Amino acid sequence: MTKKNLAVCSFCGRSEKDVEKLIAGPSVYICDYCIKLCSGILDKTPAPATQEIATSSTSSPTSLRVLTPKEIKRHIDSYVIGQERAKKTISVAVYNHYKRIRALMQDKQVSYGKSNVLLLGPTGSGKTLIAKTLAKILDVPFTIADATTLTEAGYVGEDVENIVLRLLQAADYDVARAERGIIYIDEIDKIGRTTANVSITRDVSGEGVQQALLKIIEGTVANIPPKGGRKHPNQEYIRVNTENILFIVGGAFVNLDKIIAKRLGRTTIGFSEETDLAVTNRDHLLAKVETEDLITFGMIPEFIGRFNCIVNCEELTLDELVEILTEPANAIVKQYTELFEEENVKLIFEKEALYAIAQKAKQAKTGARALGMILENLLRDLMFEIPSDPTVEAIRIEEDTITQNKPPVIIQKSPEAIA
């Protein structure tokens, strides 16, 4: 085995030649040195796996503060541009979900239904960001999973229950907190079909994953292996009740608009052309989605039936992409401006340049995700040179910098300022 191919400890980086033992796990390794180190830490503090195994929250009813839908949306607005309908819908769903938990903790006679959410929309439209922002607002454990990595029992891949393990880890193994957490599952549409073409024929293993997810989404007491991986006899488990975990799933559902149009008796001629009219028509159709459309797409009825909130995230407009660049609390332009300010250099973006960046992102068809890549490629060389050049006072990004690959305008300091 060459040095390049030597297995190394995932924690300390020692290779298998530098340690006595190297234990392999799912895509990770741990050496005997790190095991001894962890053992010493665990001897001083109770190990999560040996703590009392709880299956329900023991917090008092007053410990759970429930924000109003308007408060939730106002916080989301600070980070997510556009998607007004989606933000309102999800704010109400989250509000009702946590009212439900509080009612259960207070032993009220009337119980509320669970408000799991299905987000439809193209890549980069803000589905994942909405879920991440919710987790920050509500101060609850949050984890993201990719549906394409999940497999049903008996297949090689990640068990569905490992999603709950990741939520438990995000809660520092506090079972009560994990049972009030949020799980976001992305690419959910990819487990409903076998090809990129719309078909009513479902992939057998994909349907199996939907069945496995259905169990934890509708609520069950899951036996979670503390270390992950496949279950085996004589293994210790942590019991987690998933009944009050909020599940949000998202997917692009490509060509779902054609299924809806067929049901409504409309034509989709010209939808392959990415014109503003075509995008608007597609968004209007997705806003009319019904359960039967998702079933035709390839999702099983029982799975879709667990999501009483189905909402469409519309494709971002040019103006919204520009707003994303500059307006949110963590806007990308603000981040880069701050980085250059630390070098005492002012970074200036002309308005036309911002629109050119937004247009370039729109052409990439990955929504807001393309914005960061465009700016990184644009500013990488400058970030390399500027720390070693005390003569630069400001950098101006013009439209030609984006559209014609012209260098940014470098404004030098006056000789007096340098001296």
Swiss-Prot record:
Sorted alphabetically, which keywords does the UniProt record give?
ATP-binding, Chaperone, Metal-binding, Nucleotide-binding, Zinc
> How the protein assembles, per its UniProt entry?
Component of the ClpX-ClpP complex. Forms a hexameric ring that, in the presence of ATP, binds to fourteen ClpP subunits assembled into a disk-like structure with a central cavity, resembling the structure of eukaryotic proteasomes.
Function in brief: ATP-dependent specificity component of the Clp protease. It directs the protease to specific substrates. Can perform chaperone functions in the absence of ClpP.
Its GO biological process annotations read: cell division; proteolysis involved in protein catabolic process
Domain ClpX-type ZB: residue ranges: 1-50
What GO cellular component term, any one, is given? HslUV protease complex
Keyword Hydrolase present in the record's keywords: the answer is no
SUPFAM superfamilies linked to this entry? Glucocorticoid receptor-like (DNA-binding domain) (SSF57716), P-loop containing nucleoside triphosphate hydrolases (SSF52540)
NCBIfam families (alphabetical): clpX, PRK05342.1
> Which branch of life, at top level?
Bacteria
Residues annotated as binding ATP: P122, T123, G124, S125, G126, K127, T128, L129
One GO MF term, please?
A: unfolded protein binding
Q: Cross-referenced InterPro entries, in alphabetical order?
A: AAA+_ATPase (IPR003593), ATP-dep_Clp_protease_ClpX (IPR050052), ATPase_AAA_core (IPR003959), Clp_ATPase_C (IPR019489), Clp_protease_ATP-bd_su_ClpX (IPR004487), ClpX_bact (IPR046425), P-loop_NTPase (IPR027417), Znf_CppX_C4 (IPR010603)
Specify the species: Chlamydia trachomatis serovar L2 (strain ATCC VR-902B / DSM 19102 / 434/Bu)
What name has this protein been given in UniProt? ATP-dependent Clp protease ATP-binding subunit ClpX
Gene3D superfamilies (UniProt xref): 1.10.8.60, ClpX chaperone, C4-type zinc finger domain (6.20.220.10), P-loop containing nucleotide triphosphate hydrolases (3.40.50.300)
Q: Which residues bind Zn(2+)?
A: C9, C12, C31, C34
The similarity annotation says: Belongs to the ClpX chaperone family.
